[in-house]
Swiss-Prot record:
Pfam families: NADH5_C (PF06455), Proton_antipo_M (PF00361), Proton_antipo_N (PF00662). The lineage of its organism: Eukaryota, Metazoa, Chordata, Craniata, Vertebrata. GO terms for molecular function: NADH dehydrogenase (ubiquinone) activity. It comes from Papio hamadryas. The chain crosses the membrane at residues 4-24, 36-56, 87-107, 122-142, 171-191, 211-233, 241-261, 272-292, 301-320, 325-347, 370-390, 406-422, 488-508, 583-603. Core subunit of the mitochondrial membrane respiratory chain NADH dehydrogenase (Complex I) which catalyzes electron transfer from NADH through the respiratory chain, using ubiquinone as an electron acceptor. Essential for the catalytic activity and assembly of complex I. This is NADH-ubiquinone oxidoreductase chain 5. Its EC number is 7.1.1.2. InterPro entries: NADH_DH_su5_C, NADHpl_OxRdtase_5_subgr, ND/Mrp_TM, NU5C-like, Proton_antipo_N.
Length: 603
């Protein structure tokens, strides 16, 4: 045990060496990106040793290394929890980051600040590993906020673009809403448990009130872009493609789901939280699959598929299967990173063209990228014996045999069919048919920095599902039994999506352009959610503020107090003055007549 903990700590510490190197020698060197990439490769190879030892020993451990601060009721320590989740996730995160960094050497080669870009990617990974290995809420919160800050810096990397800056601010604002829930949960645990250590919280009261669990759920909804707080995820595609690949595969977006997995022992007996998680995940997976079906931006299609798969993970947590949700996190990371790298390869070769309607015929000009894109999409749909099959098929089986909610099952099956539909649409429009891009486009996929990551991730997308499922520690749950037609239900829905999409694509190839129906607009406009939240509500607030300012400032203050008040004062004075007609003789005469009459009466 001491051996594999020491090796794992050494692996994590080695990741900080490139950052310290920039502090010692801040001068820009051309070899720094290669140095970071090589460090990542060695860290991955080293991390395989403790992971292998853990799989054979199945003994988790906690490392208490440093007491940071003590108060009367709270002891804050730096401690690492090396259990099944962290030991399995660390090599996966390192492998994917290594591949993405090698891809970045090709994709970002012309960027003048490539050294800083690699440094940001490395810090992004380190903060995620801090979150994964945290043994207390304080350390988890540091990693939680770290991935949020780094996502802001990386999404807005091309800060000369207005859309990139807007997308980065949008990501931060939506994550702030989720952070409120995490902070409320931390305050509640501190007040009621006087501790932020996971072991003590579970030992003191495994059945807390729903309030902190609602806070944790809100945090997960914000970070993992569930329905309601989802618009930031497709907007984050404004960042460079390596950022999108790292953000969506093994770092920020899975942090919310991982938070619920880590706190699942507190949630498993709370039916309200479980049902909310289940229903929210079901709505998210269906809505995002619907949105992906009508998008034309290749990166946004992959982004919506990520959000749909995150909804599937939430469904799994909602039916009390945290290990299955974690398995889907691990398998999903490989083919999602590969899909983004293949998309980046196509975009880069087509001179930054992202519209799939302007592609086509790429299978002959980019054979390796095309093959990997097909394998990645097939793994995403859950085709048997690819990586995605081992987790996605199990999730649908677990949902089918769950007594919780038949409505969630039906929505999950529809979303599964839609997943195969938009994956097939992407393959057909991007790779097949006649080329629809300019003929002078120079396509070249011979760079080793592009080919090696794609080959590695393609291989991983085919075999890692089998390897991981064979190394899950045994649980006490009985093996579910089900009829054959229920066992093949997921495959039926996937095949249905393939067939419908193929038929629709062949049928619509030669149709005239018509006005799209309202259902198409609803899906294409993302359910009008961004229009209402980002346009209509701010417009109404601005209009109301303008009217209020007009009434208070212009109409009342400026007019009533200054110009109109002066004129009104002068009008009143002039009216008083002009009421006297200057008929002094008539006035004296009218005074003398009654006086004369009085004198006559007295005589």
């Amino acid at each position: 045990m001491a051996m594999y903990t020491s090796i794992m700590l050494m692996t994590l510490a080695s990741l900080a060496l490139p950052i310290f190197a920039t502090l010692v020698n801040p001068n820009k060197t051309h070899s720094y990106p290669n140095y970071v990439k090589t460090t990542m490769m060695y860290a991955f190879i080293t991390s395989l040793i403790p992971t292998t030892l853990y799989i054979f020993s199945n003994q988790e451990t906690t490392i208490w290394s440093w007491h940071w601060m003590m108060t009367q009721t709270l002891d804050l320590t730096l401690s690492f929890k090396l259990d099944y989740f962290s030991m399995m996730f660390i090599p996966i995160a390192l492998f994917i980051t290594w591949s993405i960094m090698e891809f970045s050497l090709w994709y970002m080669s012309s960027d003048p600040n490539i050294n800083q870009f690699f440094k940001y990617l490395l810090i992004f990974l380190i903060t995620m590993l801090i979150l994964i290995t945290a043994n207390n809420l304080f350390q988890l919160f540091i990693g939680w906020e770290g991935v949020g800050i780094m996502s802001f810096l990386l999404i807005s990397w091309w800060h000369a673009r207005t859309d990139a800056n807007t997308a980065a601010i949008q990501a931060v604002l939506y994550n702030r809403i989720g952070d409120i829930g995490l902070i409320l949960a931390m305050v509640w645990f501190l007040l009621h448990y006087n501790s932020w250590d996971f072991q003590q919280m579970l030992a003191l009261n495994p059945h807390p009130s729903p309030l902190p669990l609602m806070g944790l759920l809100l945090a997960a909804v914000g970070k993992s872009a569930q329905f309601g707080l989802h618009p930031w995820l497709p907007s984050a595609m404004e960042g460079p493609t390596p950022v999108s690949a790292l953000l969506h595969s093994s770092t920020m977006v899975v942090a919310g789901v991982f938070l619920l997995i880590r706190f699942h022992p507190l949630m498993e007996n709370d039916t309200l939280t479980q049902n909310l998680t289940l229903c929210l995940g079901a709505i998210t997976t269906l809505f995002m699959a619907m949105c992906a079906l009508t998008q034309n931006d290749i990166k946004k299609i992959v982004a919506f598929s990520t959000s749909s798969q995150l909804g599937l993970m939430m469904i799994t947590i909602g039916i009390n299967q945290p290990y299955l949700a974690f398995l889907h996190i691990c398998t999903h990371a490989f083919f999602k990173a590969m899909l983004f790298i293949c998309s980046g390869s196509i975009i880069h070769n087509l001179n930054n063209e992202q519209d799939i309607r302007k592609m086509g015929g790429l299978f002959k000009t980019m054979p390796l990228t095309s093959t990997s894109l097909i394998i990645g999409n097939l793994a995403l749909t859950g085709i048997p014996f690819l990586t995605g099959f081992y987790s996605k098929d199990l999730i649908i089986e677990a949902t089918s045999t769950s007594y919780t909610n038949a409505w969630a099952l039906s929505i999950t099956l529809i979303a599964t069919s839609l997943t195969s539909a938009y994956s097939t649409r992407t393959i057909l429009l991007t790779l097949t048919g006649q080329p629809r891009f300019p003929t002078l486009t120079n396509i070249n996929e011979n760079n080793p920095a592009l080919l090696n990551p794609i080959k590695r991730l393609t291989t991983a997308s085919m075999i890692t599902g089998f390897l991981i499922t064979n190394n899950i520690p045994p649980t006490s749950l009985p093996q579910p039994t089900m009829p054959l037609h229920l066992k093949l239900l997921a495959l039926y829905m996937t095949a249905l999506g393939f067939i419908i999409t193929l038929d629709l694509t062949l049928m619509t190839n030669k149709l005239k352009v018509k006005t799209p129906p309202q259902t198409f607009k609803f899906s294409n406009m993302l359910g009008y959610f961004p229009t209402i939240a980002h346009r209509m509500i701010p417009h109404q607030n601005l209009l109301m503020s303008q009217n209020l300012a007009l009434l208070l400032l212009d109409s009342m203050w400026l007019e009533k107090s200054m110009p109109k008040m002066i004129s009104q004062t002068h009008i009143t004075a002039s009216t008083t003055v002009t009421a006297q007609k200057s008929m002094i003789k008539l006035y004296f005469l009218s005074f003398l007549i009654p006086l004369a009459l009085a004198l006559l009466l007295m005589v």
